[in-house]
Amino acid sequence: MTVKGIGIDAVDVARFRTSLARTPSMRQRLFTPEELEYVAPKIDPVPSLAARFAAREAVMKAMGLGLGAFGFHEVWVSRAPSGAPSLRITGRALELAVDRGITVWHLSITHTDLVAIAHVVAE
């Protein structure tokens, strides 16, 4: 397959933590119930949430789009049976991907207590 786009994003975990604390409704606005359920048992879910937010941003960048091109719930991070993260694309985000000939997504996410990073390749 041909690479159609590459996106990478980094999120400052402390800054993201402050935003979540300042606006508690942000969790439901940004993340799907599946994502919130995944991070719920974690002692500190914020780095994992920051990585999932970075994944959304990286998808936008891989498609050459800016913030607001599609809703936050139209792209989310799921887990494959192996435990590997994978992308779920729906709604307007899926329409935009199809328009660009994108049918395959590759995702890598990582985080520390300081930074969360997502790298996306669109084919």
Regions found by a protein language model. Give the residues of each.
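Core catalytic alpha/beta fold that binds nucleotide/phospho-ligands
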Residues: M1-E123
